């Protein structure tokens, strides 16, 4: 049985690990993977058709804990303990819930002190006792007690006291004064762990198509002072097609991983693929997982030839490998009654709305099947790749964009027919 320390408005954890409000989804999953022998039977709950309409939930079924992540920024918003019989809880080092100590209203009052009167919810038949960043829900023993605590009683205060002996049914840790209005806080400095994160990524565009990326980056850097003086730093960097390896390293730092391509599965869709001379060396990617970006370099020139932006939607084959890339892509729209204008595509745009903006149907997609090996099937199904303005949009079956691949301009001297090479 887990023995955990409760820190209101901040975290739930022990000496080895801690779930902290504002923590990115990938870090919480990394904790669960590292301690998989202790924390077992974890479920990932999300809406397959509308992933932005509901929180993304990690349900620790064996321990009675739910971690609720904001559907948009994918940071930890609420920690819910829904079965207190499966876990030991303490506050300031003193247990208020264990096999020997029942979490009664008297015990909560002794451990946490006085607060505003409890609020009664007649639909749930629960009392909610609220502290800043912490709420307890108490179960009533019977319906006969309910009329004593009508919501309109005492000028809006739902109760003057909760029945003696009532025990906690659920506990919530969140940011702010209200569980209903809470939002995931900014990522705590303790969660940066030496990584750089992207607050936003803007695609830079010229007359012919995308030319590079402008990234607004966050880092928890230390100045010349002590480690305790570490604070968040915000800075901007830009990388372009044709930049060298050294240019990218100086702008973004070292990648988390370097991946060498063994084959190009999209080559068959390029003009005259059989005439292309096989290369003796392979193109390679810089994988920046916390930026949600991959950068492909040409094996011969060692210059940028492709950017890949990842949205990290649940239900995609690459889910939880990348941090969500919050991108904005300007699209050139040509309409009969108006001159050329620009519309913005974001991480949260749906593909049908993009097609509607374009005002004309896009060509039929290439169907992409992913699997870890030739004999395995992808449980999430295929995705569809649409080419548009030197970009390829990978679209999931729920109409959300899984990734966007940006291509650089054709090499000088290349034939015009190869300009839209996928």
Swiss-Prot record:
Coiled coil (UniProt feature): none
Keywords linked to the UniProt accession: Cytoplasm
| Keyword Magnesium attributed | no
Q: Is Cytoplasm there in the keyword field?
A: yes
Q: Tell me where in or outside the cell this protein is found.
A: Cytoplasm; Preautophagosomal structure
Q: Which InterPro entries match?
A: PHAF1 (IPR005373), PHAF1/BROMI (IPR039156)
Which superkingdom does the taxonomy of this entry point to? Eukaryota
Q: What is its main location?
A: cytoplasm
One GO location term (cellular component): phagophore assembly site
Q: How does it assemble?
A: Interacts with BCAS3; the interaction is requrired for the association with the phagophore.
- The family this protein is said to belong to: Belongs to the PHAF1 family.
Protein name, entry field: Phagosome assembly factor 1
- What's the source species for this entry? Rattus norvegicus (Rat)
């Amino acid at each position: 049985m887990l023995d955990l320390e409760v820190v209101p408005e901040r975290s739930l954890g022990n000496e080895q690990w801690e779930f902290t409000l504002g923590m990115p989804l990938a870090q919480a999953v990394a904790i669960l993977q590292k301690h998989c022998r202790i924390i077992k039977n974890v479920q990932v709950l999300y809406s397959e058709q509308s992933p932005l309409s509901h929180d993304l939930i990690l349900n620790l079924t064996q321990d009675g804990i739910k971690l609720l992540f904001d559907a948009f920024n994918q940071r930890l918003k609420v920690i819910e303990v829904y079965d207190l019989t499966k876990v030991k809880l303490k506050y300031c080092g003193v247990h208020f819930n264990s096999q020997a100590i029942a979490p009664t209203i008297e015990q909560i009052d002794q451990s946490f002190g006085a607060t505003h009167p409890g609020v009664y919810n007649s639909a749930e038949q629960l009392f909610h006792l609220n502290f800043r960043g912490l709420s307890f829900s108490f179960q009533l023993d019977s319906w006969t007690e309910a009329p004593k605590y009508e919501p309109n009683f005492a000028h809006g205060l739902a109760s003057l006291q909760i029945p003696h002996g009532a025990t906690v049914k659920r506990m919530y840790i969140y940011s702010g004064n209200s569980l209903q209005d809470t939002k995931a806080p900014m990522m705590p400095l303790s969660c940066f762990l030496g990584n750089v994160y992207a607050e936003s990524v803007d695609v830079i565009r010229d007359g012919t198509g995308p030319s590079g990326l402008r990234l607004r980056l966050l880092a928890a850097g230390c100045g010349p002072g002590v480690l305790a003086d570490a604070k968040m730093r915000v800075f901007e960097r830009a990388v372009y097609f044709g930049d060298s390896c050294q240019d990218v390293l100086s702008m973004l730092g070292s990648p988390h991983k370097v991946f060498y391509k063994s084959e190009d599965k999209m080559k068959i869709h390029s003009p005259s693929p059989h005439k292309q001379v096989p290369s003796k060396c392979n193109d390679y990617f810089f994988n920046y997982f916390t930026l949600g970006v991959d950068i492909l370099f040409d094996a011969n020139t060692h210059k940028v030839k492709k950017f890949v932006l990842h949205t990290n939607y649940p239900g995609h084959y690459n889910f939880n490998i990348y941090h969500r890339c919050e991108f904005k892509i300007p699209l050139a729209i040509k309409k009969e009654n108006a001159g050329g204008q620009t519309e913005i595509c974001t991480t949260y745009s749906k593909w049908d709305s993009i097609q509607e903006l374009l005002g004309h149907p896009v060509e039929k997609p290439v169907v992409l099947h992913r699997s870890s090996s030739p004999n395995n099937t992808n449980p999430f199904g295929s995705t569809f790749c649409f080419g548009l303005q030197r970009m390829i949009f990978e679209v999931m079956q729920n109409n959300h964009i899984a990734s966007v691949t940006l291509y650089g301009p054709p090499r000088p001297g290349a034939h015009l027919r190869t300009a839209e090479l996928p």
